[in-house]
């Protein structure tokens, strides 16, 4: 399912949230409305956590993560790190990274198996990515843009890339990521896809300006209409078996 949201009248919600299959981080804000949208969709399946990183609210651009782990920049405070650690599942590894390109969400993007990174990312950061997030790492550009984390969003089901990505590039990226890709936009024509949306395997959140056409493309490529969080599917299956026995 795809849901529209805005953060204090700002439609770039991908800047203020980080969504994975095992947790969701939401920026600390003056209004609870934004948090409530996530809580309403995700409650009972994964923890939704208020957080800031390095004193910033743009947490979606500052960190990178999947269900295995979370990487945050080196200037994240001890207090912030401890708060996130306390709220996330024990299986999720959290690591600070010493990286010149410190807005990790802009220069890296990943699902639970593969990561695309900025061509100039440190070798050490690449190794930490592979180790903590348990992913295969590829240095790549998207539509000749080095900020792969800004112009590409993908889950384990599918992905959305910059609208000017050529068919050849789409095919190459798709074979690397092993998921189908579509070139598109969010927020009524915005090319900065990752700033306008967040997605996991069963749910997507897009900026309030996103048109119904863009929303239907998101639901289609990320296979959201057929997806369910595994915990819900399991409990439904269990109750069905109970009622039949």
From Swiss-Prot:
Transmembrane stretches, start-end = none
Sorted alphabetically, the Gene Ontology BP terms of this entry are:
assembly of large subunit precursor of preribosome; cytosolic ribosome assembly; maturation of 5.8S rRNA; maturation of LSU-rRNA; miRNA-mediated gene silencing by inhibition of translation; miRNA-mediated post-transcriptional gene silencing; positive regulation of translation; regulation of fatty acid biosynthetic process
The protein's matches in Gene3D superfamilies, at most eight in alphabetical order, are given as: L-arginine/glycine Amidinotransferase, Chain A
Q: Which InterPro entries match?
A: eIF6 (IPR002769)
- Keyword Cytoplasm annotated: yes
Per the UniProt entry, the disulfide pairs are: none
Give one Pfam family, short name only. eIF-6
Protein biosynthesis as a keyword of this entry, yes or no, is yes
How is the protein modified post-translationally, according to the record? Phosphorylation at Ser-174 and Ser-175 by CSNK1D/CK1 promotes nuclear export. Ufmylated by UFL1.
GO MF terms listed in the record are:
ribosomal large subunit binding; translation initiation factor activity
Query: What highest taxon heads this organism's lineage?
Result: Eukaryota
Q: What does this protein do?
A: Binds to the 60S ribosomal subunit and prevents its association with the 40S ribosomal subunit to form the 80S initiation complex in the cytoplasm. Behaves as a stimulatory translation initiation factor downstream insulin/growth factors. Is also involved in ribosome biogenesis. Associates with pre-60S subunits in the nucleus and is involved in its nuclear export. Cytoplasmic release of TIF6 from 60S subunits and nuclear relocalization is promoted by a RACK1 (RACK1)-dependent protein kinase C activity.
* Description of how the protein assembles with itself and partners: Monomer. Associates with the 60S ribosomal subunit. Interacts with RACK1. Interacts with DICER1, AGO2, TARBP2, MOV10 and RPL7A; they form a large RNA-induced silencing complex (RISC).
Q: What is this protein called?
A: Eukaryotic translation initiation factor 6
Gene symbol of the encoding locus: EIF6
């Amino acid at each position: 399912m795809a849901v529209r949201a805005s953060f204090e009248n700002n439609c770039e919600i991908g800047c203020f949230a980080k969504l994975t299959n095992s947790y969701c981080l939401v920026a600390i804000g003056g209004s609870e409305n934004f948090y409530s949208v996530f809580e309403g969709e995700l409650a009972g399946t994964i923890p939704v956590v208020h957080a800031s990183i390095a004193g910033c609210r743009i947490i979606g651009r500052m960190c990178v993560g999947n269900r295995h782990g979370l990487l945050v920049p080196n200037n994240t405070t001890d207090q912030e790190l401890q708060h996130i650690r306390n709220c996330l599942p024990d299986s999720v590894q959290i690591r600070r990274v010493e990286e010149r390109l410190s807005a990790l969400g802009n220069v890296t993007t990943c699902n639970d198996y593969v990561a695309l990174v900025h061509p100039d990312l440190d070798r050490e950061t690449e190794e930490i990515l592979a180790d903590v997030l348990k992913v295969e790492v590829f240095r790549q550009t998207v539509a000749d843009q080095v900020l792969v984390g800004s112009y590409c969003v993908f889950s384990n089901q599918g992905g959305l890339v910059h609208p000017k990505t050529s068919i050849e590039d789409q095919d190459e990226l798709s074979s690397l990521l092993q998921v189908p890709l579509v070139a598109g936009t969010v927020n009524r024509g915005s090319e900065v896809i990752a700033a306008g949306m967040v997605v996991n395997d069963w749910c997507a959140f897009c900026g309030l300006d996103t048109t119904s056409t863009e929303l239907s493309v998101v639901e289609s490529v990320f296979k959201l209409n057929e997806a369910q969080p595994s915990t819900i599917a399991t409990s439904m299956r269990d109750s069905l078996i109970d009622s039949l026995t």
